[in-house]
Amino acid sequence: PLSINVAAVLSRAFDGKLPISYSGGASKFNISDIFETGIRPITMATDLLKPGGYLRQIECLKEIDASDSWGMSQVDVAKLEALAAKALTMDYTQKEWKSEDRIEVGGGLPLTDCYVAPCVTACAVHQDIPEYIRLMGEGEYVAALELIYQRNALPAITGHICDHQCQYNCTRLDYDSPLNIRELKKVALERGWEGYKARWHKPAGSGDKHPVAVIGAGPAGLSAGYFLARAGHPVTLFEREADAGGVVKHIIPEFRIPAELIQHDIDFVAAHGVKFEFGCDPALTVDKLHAQGFTYVFVGIGADKNGGMRLEGGHDRVYKSFHFLRSFNQGKPLPLGRHVAVIGAGNTAMDCARAALKVPGVSDVTVIYRRSEKEMPAYREEYLEAVEDGVRFCFLTNPERFDKDGKLTVRMMALGDPDEQGRRRPVPTEQTEVMQMDALITAIGEQPDCEVLKAMGIPLGSDGWPEVDSQSGETSRRNVFLIGDVQSGPSSIVGAIGGARRAVDLVLAREHIASQQRDVATQPSGKDEIYRRKGSIAVTLVDKNERDAFVAQEAHRCLECNYLCSKCVDVCPNRANVAIAVPGFKDQFQTLHLDAYCNECGNCAQFCPWQGKPYQDKVTIFSLPEDFDNSRNPGFYLADGGELRVRQDGETYRLTIDAQSRIKDAPAALGDMCRIISHEIGRAHV
């Protein structure tokens, strides 16, 4: 907006007769509009340093080539002023248009075979996202749904209320906007269910498989039952409520997910042969279940203990979040009055605030949070939905007193040093304020009830918490597992599914049963097609309700980055990173770094999803011996006479390579490095 408005001011002053060379934010989004004003030439720089930047020049040139404005001899001031005004409000010029999320895989950058789909690694169940999106784009909805069911027991539920970490880590964020992956999952179920159900067969149970008891029929318990039954285990779910669904059914408001979709997933779990016992004995213990013949016991009772808040003043309308939400879902909302405060800023607080606004008689709801908006734990989407509904937010405030006359005294806070989770600590100030409230809902401090676990027979450590393996969820009592929020603390639905899956995998390993998760063997799109997608920007997105067009658009936008990435190659201004095809590796290409071309600008590291720097971590070709000596990069230098100097993992080796590009006496640890070296040197000698 700044550059185009400067151009407008100058053109107005010179009546359009001042020749202007434009450089400052020209991109696929506006280059045609800029050209139509008569500005010549238009130069682009920043966009070239982004993934797909060079490839996008083709689209830009096509747009300009089709223009009728080639004959303009001066700037059209009216058009330019209109464009300048438009630039101030266009979506792509607004700060919120570009997500602040950084695509991250976690872990160091591998020397070879680094192609990865960040959406998959971010997903708690490692859903095969690029594969099922490709199948949907081909119209294979049944196959796509079958693929989803391999890792996800509850696609109807997660199609609505998944926290979609996949979208926050979609590679498209570096191009335009992330794929709407959660909505695609919903479409896969809508269009694939009837065909999938027609060819689905109930798993055949086996008399030699040990029975499993699952306490709790929430998302974690349902998922454990699904995966265990699919492998042939007899499973019984014990639930204290009158029906299954847990927090999704009884706590999350129905305006977020229709009840029939929750029931869809429950019914399909039951169709696998899982038995349900509702209204079970609250005093059910592990010992009692063992006595009934259950070899394995899974405990998925959630984290619904809420300590509430201790406030002076004695007001009697102070409710705990789960109590309020349960009453709301039953159609029996608690008395709130007109003005309601919700304490906390997590996802449960957002549900409470939005639900409270729908209670008859409530005129306004205010969320009170002791940190700033940046530190709030609620998912961004849920926060924005609350804002859209009209929920007010008071950040950096903490309640201290709630008097019977409705006066709520809050202390203003400031942010101090970061805590162990990286969020800045709230520090009290001397300033207080008074608000007028009729009711207060506390949505803080949900945690597992360790006393209940102890009564069940779950061993607790000296700190009062269960002794549990963080990966499998197995307690110090063999074959007894904690799954879902009771193991991890308050988390997401898909996190509960993933935790249940890991626990089931350990049981299957002990039972010598092959995992039900099979590697996906689908044919990826060709590299030429994927490169075309890299050069394509979605200026406008199709409405998700136009299902055919929506699926086609998103399938075309998917970059299939586990089959082809090379972002570090795309964004290097000096072309110091190159992709070469080397036989014998998983990925189509391996990345080589050319030391002589690199000025260490770090642009490749900026866009790499790994916690690494391609210009330092990839196999590096050195042109001079002194460059090799002055670097720590893994790589090689080939001297005259076939002497080969190689460095890997900080160790330097002196080897020789013959005329057939065979490296002699190379240690086994250098296998991948030597394969690349032999291929490159052999190619150079052809």
Language-model features: locations:
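C-terminal helical cap(s) of enzyme catalytic domains, especially alpha/beta-barrels
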Residues: 50-74
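Ferredoxin-like iron-sulfur electron-transfer modules
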Residues: 99-122, 143-164, 196-213, 249-250, ...
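Iron-sulfur cluster-binding cysteine motifs and their immediate structural context
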Residues: 113, 117-138, 159-189, 236, ...
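Beta1-alpha1 glycine-rich phosphate/pyrophosphate-binding loop at the start
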Residues: 127-137, 145, 174, 178-182, ...
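Glycine-rich dinucleotide-binding loop and its adjacent helix/turn
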Residues: 189-205, 264-279, 306-360, 462-471, ...
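FAD-site-proximal beta/loop scaffold in flavoenzymes
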Residues: 316-337, 420-490
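A conserved FAD-binding loop/helix module that cradles the flavin
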Residues: 483-511
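Conserved small/polar residues in nucleotide/adenosyl-binding loops
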Residues: 684-686
